């Protein structure tokens, strides 16, 4: 089976031949100083297309929120995986991302024939896999996974903001912004902060 996803800037993606069920996998949250790295795996239904899939970062919040339930409803299977802040500190962010991706794929209620991973590294998997640079723009399954992962993590940051409103998590989503740095300097770190990340280590005096 050969499918193509067209992009104005990138070459069309040629799906590997000889496979039927493709899972797209993407992550959100490698860069933030707080919270989990969240991954999603999605197997789309070719007979039930979803309009408007692209890299989640290129969509408005409103559009992501509209696509989120549509993907959940129309996909053949979808699953979330995650590594919490303490796991990131133990493993490092790259390895934690790989583990979270493994968890997302393992959670699918349909086993894919092939995993398409956004980026340039494939975790150890029980099926064939391929890393796709800019995959969230080139591969519909990865686009869908990026939307599921981002909406999920953004909602978690909004919940964390309710518990710790002084940090502004709903606005910066835990990323290393000036406002976040200032909040850490003033209020210290919380249990969800990643202690292995340099800005957090600096505040803790363990650099």
Curated annotation (Swiss-Prot):
Keywords linked to the UniProt accession: Cytoplasm, Endonuclease, Hydrolase, Manganese, Metal-binding, Nuclease
Pfam families the UniProt entry points to: RNase_HII
Enzyme Commission identifier(s): 3.1.26.4
Catalytic activities: Endonucleolytic cleavage to 5'-phosphomonoester
GO cellular component: cytoplasm; ribonuclease H2 complex
Annotated positions binding a divalent metal cation: 26-27, 118
Domain of life per record: Bacteria
CDD domains, sorted: RNase_HII_bacteria_HII_like
Protein's job: Endonuclease that specifically degrades the RNA of RNA-DNA hybrids.
Name the UniProt record assigns to this protein: Ribonuclease HII
Organism phylogeny: Bacteria, Pseudomonadati, Pseudomonadota, Gammaproteobacteria, Vibrionales
């Amino acid at each position: 089976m050969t499918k193509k996803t067209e992009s104005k800037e990138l070459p069309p993606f040629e799906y590997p031949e000889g496979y039927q069920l493709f899972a797209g996998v993407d992550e959100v949250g490698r860069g933030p100083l707080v919270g989990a790295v969240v991954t999603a795996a999605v197997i789309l239904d070719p007979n039930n297309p979803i309009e408007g899939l692209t890299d989640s970062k290129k969509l408005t919040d409103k559009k992501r929120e509209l696509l989120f339930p549509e993907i959940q409803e129309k996909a053949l299977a979808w699953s979330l995986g995650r590594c919490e802040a303490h796991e990131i500190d133990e493993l490092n962010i790259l390895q934690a991302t790989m583990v979270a991706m493994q968890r997302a794929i393992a959670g699918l209620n349909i086993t894919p024939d092939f995993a398409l991973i956004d980026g340039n590294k494939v975790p150890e998997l029980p099926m064939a896999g391929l890393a796709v640079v800019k995959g969230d723009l080139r591969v519909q399954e990865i686009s869908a996974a990026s939307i599921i992962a981002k909406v999920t993590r953004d909602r978690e940051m909004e919940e964390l903001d309710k518990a710790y409103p002084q940090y502004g998590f709903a606005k910066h989503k835990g990323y290393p912004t000036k406002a976040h740095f200032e909040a850490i300097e003033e209020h210290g770190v919380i249990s969800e902060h990643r202690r292995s990340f340099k800005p957090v280590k600096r505040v803790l005096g363990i650099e």
